[in-house]
């Protein structure tokens, strides 16, 4: 079974309070997905989903995304083993963003750098220039080793 999504209602009240899930995909056919840890609420990543990725996520309970750089569907954790089991899916008021609450398998890391979250740096100003500072040095796995094993 593959879910399909009806076109969003033009009636704002229906879109915001009605029972129909009608995601508002952008002009490229994507919707933004915000992903947090279901256990502690930590922000893990922000990604994009097309209709197929969203349908697979709902149907399988495992997070799937659409890679804009590769222009392809991607099952999160397929290479690293850090799959995301979806505990809850929410949508925002106008259904143009998705919030996934997940538990991460494997090394409990979401970022391809080996870190738990893709948000491991803070942004600030130093000598009048915007700079980033790494605030999470801990890597749950060695990306060179994990991704080399999958390629080999």
Swiss-Prot record:
GO MF term (any one): magnesium ion binding
Binding residues for Zn(2+): 93, 111, 118
Primary residence: cytoplasm
One Gene Ontology term, aspect cellular component: cytoplasm
Subcellular compartments: Cytoplasm
Cofactor binding summary note: Binds 1 Mg(2+) ion per subunit. Binds 1 zinc ion per subunit.
Organism: Sinorhizobium fredii (strain NBRC 101917 / NGR234)
Pathway assigned in UniProt: Amino-acid biosynthesis; L-histidine biosynthesis; L-histidine from 5-phospho-alpha-D-ribose 1-diphosphate: step 3/9
Cofactors required: Mg(2+); Zn(2+)
Catalytic activity: 1-(5-phospho-beta-D-ribosyl)-5'-AMP + H2O = 1-(5-phospho-beta-D-ribosyl)-5-[(5-phospho-beta-D-ribosylamino)methylideneamino]imidazole-4-carboxamide
EC number annotated for this UniProt entry: 3.5.4.19
Subunit-structure text: Homodimer.
Similarity comment text for this entry: Belongs to the PRA-CH family.
Function: Catalyzes the hydrolysis of the adenine ring of phosphoribosyl-AMP.
Organism domain of life: Bacteria
Binding, Mg(2+): 92, 94, 96
Pfam families to which the protein is assigned, alphabetical: PRA-CH
One BP term from GO: L-histidine biosynthetic process
Listed name of the protein: Phosphoribosyl-AMP cyclohydrolase
């Amino acid at each position: 079974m593959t879910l399909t999504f009806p076109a969003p209602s033009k009636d704002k009240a229906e879109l915001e309070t009605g029972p129909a899930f009608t995601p508002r995909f952008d002009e490229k056919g994507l919707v933004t997905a915000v992903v947090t840890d279901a256990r502690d609420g930590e922000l893990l990543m922000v990604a994009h989903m097309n209709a197929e990725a969203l349908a697979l996520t709902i149907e399988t309970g495992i997070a799937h995304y659409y890679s804009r750089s590769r222009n392809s569907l991607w099952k999160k954790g397929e290479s690293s083993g850090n799959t995301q089991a979806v505990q809850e899916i929410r949508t925002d008021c106008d259904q143009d963003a998705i919030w996934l609450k997940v538990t991460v398998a494997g090394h409990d890391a979401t970022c391809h750098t080996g870190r738990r979250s893709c948000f491991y740096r803070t942004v600030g100003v130093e000598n009048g220039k915007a700079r980033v500072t790494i605030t999470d040095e801990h890597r749950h796995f060695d990306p060179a080793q994990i991704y080399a094993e999958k390629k080999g």
